[in-house]
């Protein structure tokens, strides 16, 4: 992965309420979003619905707001659970970064101090550009603390740090 990722935004798939926010096996819309990112020379796609970020093509987007809280999309709005976030959330909070689900509106994203994305296949990555627009200051406090927490989990876990380098 590059030091700082770039993203494009794509329309999120429409799921009925029973399926929304669950890992149900129909990955094609996510694969299509990933392909669109690559076609547009971006690293990832962010899925948008009603002017809000609800998920990533293969990751959970998280932003550090000007209020000091880290926000991630809510499951009830279509985000999928993040195993990576669950692994590091308590440690982030213990290190002074409260983590909360939120409606990640475009205005919230645009005022973010920083953004990262988390995924079991990518670890912790810094996100610095969305649709050609710079977002916050990449590789700042959120990235550094999240990466430190993630590397600690990996070093005491079943996967090797080398798997993510």
Describe the role of every protein-language-model region.
Residues 1-165:
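Helix-start/capping segments and mature chain N-termini
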């Amino acid at each position: 992965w590059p030091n700082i990722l770039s993203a494009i935004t794509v329309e999120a798939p429409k799921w009925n309420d029973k399926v929304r926010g669950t890992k149900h096996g129909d990955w094609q819309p996510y694969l299509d979003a990933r392909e669109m990112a690559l076609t547009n020379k971006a690293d990832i796609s962010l899925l948008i619905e009603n002017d809000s970020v609800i998920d990533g093509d293969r990751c959970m987007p998280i932003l550090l707001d000007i209020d000091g809280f880290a926000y991630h999309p809510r499951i009830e709005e279509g985000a999928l659970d993040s195993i990576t976030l669950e692994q590091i959330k308590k440690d982030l909070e213990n290190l002074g970064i409260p983590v909360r689900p939120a409606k990640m509106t475009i205005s919230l994203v645009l005022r973010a101090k920083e953004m990262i994305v988390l995924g079991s296949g990518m670890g912790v990555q810094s996100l610095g550009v969305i649709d050609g627009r710079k977002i916050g200051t990449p590789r700042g406090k959120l990235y550094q603390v999240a990466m430190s927490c993630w590397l600690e989990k990996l070093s005491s876990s079943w996967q090797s740090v080398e798997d993510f380098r």
